[in-house]
């Protein structure tokens, strides 16, 4: 099948960034469980999101994207709908075998462009100061630290960041 103009937005160098399809649900779960288990534990809310991503992320208005190299899914990120124009960036992971190739940065740039094209007002995220590389990418892309609210969705979170798009 030939390349169409609509495919251009997905191409980033040698990789493709593609939207969610149900056949990639297991990749979404496994990629995220790998980094969660490496640095933390898989919390109950994580398990819900990862095992029911269509119901909890997509149906309420969220989005999931994947990095595909050849036919292999090697990275993912999600936007979780919070309120009109406000989304939480989360569940961002790159397979350890493919880390160090700036795939996370390329995925982040795609995610930011997607938010801007959709005229969102704000992106929020929750992270941990333990994830220095992730925090560097967030700060490099304009995210700033904001106060944490009570009743956080994740026990591991000790930092909240946001990026105002308007």
PLM feature segments, named:
Residues 1-23, 165-166:
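Conserved N-terminal entry element of GNAT/NAT acetyltransferase domains
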